[in-house]
Structures are given as C-alpha cells and as structure tokens.
Amino acid sequence: MATFTDAEIDELFETSGTVIDNIITAQGKPAETVGRSAIPQGKTKVLSAAWEKHGSIQPPASQDNPDRQDRSDKQPSTPEQTTPHDSPPATSADQPPTQATDEAVDTQLRTGASNSLLLMLDKLSNKSSNAKKGPMVEPPRGESPTSDSTAGESTQSRKQSGKTAEPSQGRPWKPGHRREHSISWTMGGVTTISWCNPSWSPIKAEPKQYPCFCGSFPPTCRLCASDDVYYGGDFPKSK
C-alpha cells in the first residue's frame, strides 16, 4: 500500500482543487460584444435560422394595402420593392463571424482546460508511483546494512565482556555472608532479630538460617562473629 507524507497529502489536495476549478471553468465566459447585447453561447445557429425563416415568409402584397396593389398595376415594379423580401435583415449577415468567433473561443478554452487536466493527472500519477517505490527500496542480496553489522558486533562484544565481568564491574566477586533482620511486634514490645546467611541463599519472608553445602562460604564473618549459634543450629536469640 502506498504511503504519503503530510507534505505530499497537502500537495495532492491542492492539485485536486486546481483540477476541480479547471473543470468548473472549462466553458469560460461568452465573447463580449460592443454596441449590442451579448448572444448566449450555443444560440447563434438557432437565431440565424429564425431570421432566415422570418425573412422567407412574407404576407402577400394584396393583403397589405389595396391601393398599393392598384398602383402597382399601373407602375412597373422596381428592384427596391423586391429585394427586402428576398434577403434577411442586415444583422443576420453579421452572425456567421460572431458564430465563428464564439466557436473558436470555446474550442480554445476547452483545449486549454484539457491540457491542464492532463498535466494534473500526470503529476498525480507520478506522485503515486514515487510514493509506492520509496518505502520498498531494499539493499541488494548478499550485502547487509552497515548498521546491522555494527549492531551485531557491539552485541557480541557486550556478551563477551559480560562473561568476564559477570559478578561485579569494579572488583572480583568472593563468597561471603549477607546480614538479614527480622522485626516483630508483640504484647511485650518490639523484637528485633539479626543473623547472617550465605550469599547464595534465597531471601524469604520467614526468618531462616541456611548452612553452607559447598564449603566455599566462611562459617563466620565480622558481622556474625559474636552471634551465639551459626549454621544449622537453633535460631539466633533476640537481643
């Protein structure tokens, strides 16, 4: 799955907004006219056909004025009386250039919008392909990253050094005693008991004195030299 950073997501949103704006404004504004009202885009052909139809249909001369018909019988007809009925108004002659201009502007706007949309789509596809390729880059087989090798070496060195200095970091470890204390509250008051145990013995809640089984621990130390009983005998008396 492709992953995007915050900057790439912001750029994608901005690019998408530009594409939407280009789609909305692809048709553009109609060409402005000087001296007359603007004709809506796409209505030029309809208006021209209406003018031609209106010019071709004219009422008979007899219905306009009976006196004019009588005068026309007596006088020869002139070209000025027939030409207005055969040709459309002067404004219709101006329509083809306006129609051509509107179509040219419309075509230019659509072509520009299409090119802009194609550029935006190419940019989006490039961003998506780069995002997919970025996180999947792996080192060639047979070569391990430098960080992994150094990490492995440092781990091995720590393990090896730990073996030699496991008991203590500053001085060699020697078997000895550990002083333990027990405090209890009774009706007679507070009772305190203290004794020594070998360093290997476990620490438990109940007071217990452990003897040495391996012979490596001394029977007494400077802390328990004055105790009454040692190792395996009765529990030391309270003092």
Swiss-Prot record:
Query: Gene3D superfamilies, alphabetically?
Result: 4.10.80.340
Q: Does the keyword NAD apply?
A: no
> Where mainly located?
host cell
Q: Which Pfam families match?
A: Soyouz_module, zf-Paramyx-P
Q: Which keywords fit this entry according to its UniProt record? A: Host cytoplasm, Host nucleus, Host-virus interaction, Inhibition of host innate immune response by virus, Inhibition of host MDA5 by virus, Inhibition of host RLR pathway by virus, Interferon antiviral system evasion, Metal-binding, Modulation of host cell apoptosis by virus, Viral immunoevasion, Zinc
Question: What residue spans carry the region label Disordered?
Answer: 47-111, 127-184
Write out the similarity annotation.
Answer: Belongs to the paramyxoviruses V protein family.
Q: Please share what else the UniProt entry notes about this protein.
A: The protein V from strain B1 contains one putative zinc-binding domain on its C-terminal region whereas protein V from wild-type avulavirus strains possess two.
Kindly indicate whether the keyword Ribosomal protein belongs to this entry.
Answer: no
Q: Name one GO biological process term.
A: symbiont-mediated suppression of host JAK-STAT cascade via inhibition of STAT1 activity
Compartments in which it is found:
Host cytoplasm; Host nucleus
The positions annotated for binding Zn(2+) 2 are C212, C214
**Chain positions recorded as Zn(2+) 1 binding sites:** H177, C196, C221, C224
Provide the protein name.
Protein V
One GO term of the cellular component aspect? host cell cytoplasm
Biased amino acid composition, Polar residues: 75-101, 144-167
The molecular function terms in GO held by this entry are: metal ion binding
Lineage, top-rank taxon, reads: Viruses
Give the protein's biological function. Answer: Protects the virus against cell antiviral state by blocking host interferon signaling. Mechanistically, targets host phosphorylated STAT1 (phospho-STAT1) for degradation, thereby inhibiting the interferon alpha signaling pathway. Plays a role in the inhibition of host apoptosis. Interacts with and down-regulates the expression of host TXNL1. In turn, inhibits TXNL1-induced apoptosis through the BCL2-BAX-caspase 3 pathway. Inhibits host apoptosis also by negatively regulating host CacyBP/SIP. Promotes viral replication by activating the extracellular signal-regulated kinase (ERK) pathway.
Cite the record's note on assembly: Interacts with host STAT1. Interacts with host TXNL1. Interacts (via C-terminus) with host CacyBP; this interaction inhibits host cell apoptosis.
Query: Which stretches are tagged as biased composition: Basic and acidic residues?
Result: 65-74
